[in-house]
Amino acid sequence: MLVCYSVLACESLWDLPCSIMGSPLGHFTWDKYLKETCSVPAPVHCFKQSYTPPSNEFKISMKLEAQDPRNTTSTCIATVVGLTGARLRLRLDGSDNKNDFWRLVDSSEIQPIGNCEKNGGMLQPPLGFRLNASSWPMFLLKTLNGAEMAPIKIFHKEPPSPSHNFFKMGMKLEAVDRKNPHFICPATIGEVRGAEVLVTFDGWRGAFDYWCRFDSRDIFPVGWCSLTGDNLQPPGTKVVIPKNPSPSSDVSTEKPSIHSTKTVLEHQPGQRGRKPGKKRGRTPKILIPHPTSTPSKSAEPLKFPKKRGPKPGSKRKPRTLLSPPPTSPTTSTPEPDTSTVPQDAATVPSSAMQAPTVCIYLNKSGSTGPHLDKKKIQQLPDHFGPARASVVLQQAVQACIDCAYHQKTVFSFLKQGHGGEVISAVFDREQHTLNLPAVNSITYVLRFLEKLCHNLRSDNLFGNQPFTQTHLSLTATEYNHNHDRYLPGETFVLGNSLARSLETHSDLMDSALKPANLVSTSQNLRTPGYRPLLPSCGLPLSTVSAVRRLCSKGVLKGKKERRDVESFWKLNHSPGSDRHLESRDPPRLSGRDPSSWTVEDVMQFVREADPQLGSHADLFRKHEIDGKALLLLRSDMMMKYMGLKLGPALKLSFHIDRLKQVFWKRETILWSREGLSREVWPISEDTALGHFFSGMDKVFGSLSKR
């Protein structure tokens, strides 16, 4: 037994006659490694990397503009907090140190200060901004005042992407460990599927390999780290790396080693060995006899009398020993496990910080549209989830593809995203894959599915509440009288039911005046993120019937006929006869214009709108939200900046929209395709009436020409 109490004593162990894959301990070289494994490095032209690595002239504390990795539509101010090789460790100003991320110096996601404004954009607070959102402009001024800006000359142009995927299975490369992005490790291409490649880390096992596109900036050619000065980790010793990687090869067994500090951790699943030279509290027993013997699969792994527990704050992921990897075709499967690495800002994945759970329900009795097979829809589960939002989105989208008559049609509606789950479709005798966008909120899932279903013309297919038989049997007319009992998003029914092309003149008039085809103002004027239910009728049913009767007698040419309809219109739109509005109006606060409300008025409105929301009224004082700000609020904004849960945010969004309907009566008329455009009028009833008859003249004029 050898026990040492100092780092120098531990370093003396390196002289023992032991090697890792043919390289002396702590001296990994690609040349010897490639010879011993009979492997081929991936050619340089396979990668989206510069042939000559760019120089890194950045300095600690420099400021620059960077894309928020958790909200890719936002450009934020970032500070350089670390440097390694050709990479920068960045921290978004206004965020904490738990969401640091790494970018190459030639990444297109980093730009010098002023680039966003130059291109007409605005700098945004990062997701999870710790201060009040209203204080962001002042925070931005203080942050940039006197700060050292990264000069334009040290930024590099991003290299072009390869023309197509040149990778082949078994090629060697260097890849970023996405669980610990400050590590770059030797890896192997485990599988090639369309534009995607499977990255497997050499010498490690588990289910932590990852798929990425062939033009990912997280993979590098062999020798990249030696050129840039970055630190390349040696291969692990969890599994023996075969000389001839084969998809059919069996899972290799462990090989005992006397690597300086990995010995005690080698047989503990879920832990990763340390780099040579790192301090530790206690040195384990060194097993010198039979250093190269390989136990059989049935043999029990070596056990030590005492095992170190995990460090405080570290998370251990349980794994089953010798379990076959689910996705990797080679024996070298997982991304290096990192339980023993300190959980600093760069090691905590942002996805672990906030993982919203969502459940999406399927409406099997709804319209599936022309692209989806109703029989296949019936075979799907009643709901997807509850699970992480990204997983549920992937399941729902994949279900639409699998149930399509032609998968290519549904696949064409989707755009390549970044950071999300992978979906696949089979057409043209090939399997095609695509990354969905990263999901950072539950509302994003609902909006995404709304747009997809609208393209598929299968509205009312998904919802975030179970579809009851009562709801499914409601007609458009019944819904217009009863929709105040439902909250927006409670049953996620898609709007924008556009009028279809009609063949006969009578059908054209019915389509232009049918209540179910008249779209409400809130639907056309809604801000992004508002999700209405079925559109409320813009005209009372009696008005529609009367106009239809007048139209059936002939075209309205004379003044008398016009006066008849005007009288009937005003009669049905007189005060107190707004049948198309809800029977229960929101609090009016003495009839004042909501845009003139003070913060106290807004708090009173919240309390009176729903007593259950009274506990949230103080948030409006804290964030200084007056009437004008109230009218601009959306449910996703209330969740993101005010910290509200989904339910209260949807309720408040519903009451705010009803408030707009009461104070600003905007009439929206959905016309057919006969050369008429759809307009929204924030105007009085008399003016709207004039527009109505002007539009009627256009319709009848078009019909008379035929």
Curated annotation (Swiss-Prot):
UniProt keyword annotations, A-Z: Developmental protein, Nucleus, Repeat, Repressor, Transcription, Transcription regulation
GO biological process terms, semicolon-separated: anterior/posterior pattern specification; chromatin remodeling; heterochromatin formation; negative regulation of DNA-templated transcription; spermatogenesis
Keyword Nucleotide-binding appears in the UniProt entry: no
Biased amino acid composition, Basic residues: 272-283, 304-319
Tissue-wise expression: Most abundant in testis. Moderate levels detected in heart, brain, lung, liver, skeletal muscle and kidney and lower levels in spleen.
UniProt feature, compositional bias: Basic and acidic residues: 576-591
Main localization of the protein described in the UniProt heading: nucleus
MBT repeats: 28-126, 134-235
GO CC annotation, single: male germ cell nucleus
UniProt-annotated stretches for the region Disordered: 233-350, 576-595
Induction section of the entry: By retinoic acid in F9 and F19 embryonal carcinoma cell lines.
Cell compartments where the protein resides: Nucleus
All copies of domain SAM, residue ranges: 597-662
Gene3D superfamilies: 2.30.30.140, SLED domain (3.90.1150.190), Transcription Factor, Ets-1 (1.10.150.50)
Compositionally biased residues, Low complexity: 329-340
Function: Associates with Polycomb group (PcG) multiprotein complexes; the complex class is required to maintain the transcriptionally repressive state of some genes.
Oligomeric and partner information: Associates with a PRC1-like complex. Interacts with the SAM domain of PHC1 via its SAM domain in vitro.
PANTHER family: POLYCOMB GROUP PROTEIN (PTHR12247), POLYCOMB PROTEIN SCMH1 (PTHR12247:SF68)
Family the entry assigns: Belongs to the SCM family.
Protein's name in the database: Polycomb protein SCMH1
Gene: Scmh1
